[in-house]
């Protein structure tokens, strides 16, 4: 009897969360283990591509965000500037990884590409749950100084891992919504 009532309670909770017609805001996702899951998947993709040599070159160089963090500069930025940098980086990574879908890829590589694109979309959803501003494209078309060009798929996935471990983690760890209960 308890098993059935527990399952029923779980079903009621799920239905409550997914009830159509309610426009309730997303609950903040402050647990960094969520990001750790995405980092692990990105790391798995990078590890799989490490052994790839000739088959992993990219026809044209792609632009990706720089992953190094100058902590003095980062701490001096307000949350909107930090959010814009992370959202911009996620946008660049999504564009770069998405550009790989055009070429003929192995099934393994294609699965890593698809997973990475889904993960970036999920990370954006996590940021949205934390009321972090969406990506706003820059008004000038000048080349951003916070970017680099890369020429291999393994480099791309390495940048993806490092970006998530660095700037994305810093932003999530210090999101104002998550710090409200901390004194």
UniProtKB/Swiss-Prot annotation:
The keyword Secreted applies. Keywords: Disulfide bond, Erythrocyte maturation, Glycoprotein, Hormone, Secreted, Signal. GO terms for cellular component: extracellular space; perinuclear region of cytoplasm. N-glycosylated. The keyword Transmembrane helix does not apply. Expressed in heart and liver. Residues 1-23 form the signal peptide. Disulfide bonds join 30-178, 52-56. Pfam families: EPO_TPO. This is Erythropoietin.
């Amino acid at each position: 009897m308890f098993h059935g009532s527990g399952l029923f309670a779980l079903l009621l909770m799920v239905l409550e969360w997914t009830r159509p017609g309610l426009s309730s805001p997303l609950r903040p996702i402050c647990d960094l283990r969520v990001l750790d899951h995405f980092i692990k998947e990105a790391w798995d993709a990078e590890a799989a591509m490490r052994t790839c040599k000739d088959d992993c070159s990219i026809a044209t160089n792609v632009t990706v965000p720089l992953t190094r963090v100058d902590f003095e500069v980062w701490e001096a930025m307000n949350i909107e500037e930090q959010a814009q940098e992370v959202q911009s980086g996620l946008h660049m990574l999504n564009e770069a990884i998405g550009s790989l879908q055009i070429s003929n890829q192995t099934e393994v590589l294609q699965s890593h590409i698809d997973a990475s694109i889904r993960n970036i979309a999920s990370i954006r959803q996590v940021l949205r749950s934390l009321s972090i501003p969406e990506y706003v494209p820059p008004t000038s078309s000048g080349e951003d100084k916070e970017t680099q060009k890369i020429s291999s798929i393994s480099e791309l996935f390495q940048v993806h891992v490092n970006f998530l471990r660095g700037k994305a983690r810093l932003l999530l760890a210090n999101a104002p919504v998550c710090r409200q209960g901390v004194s």
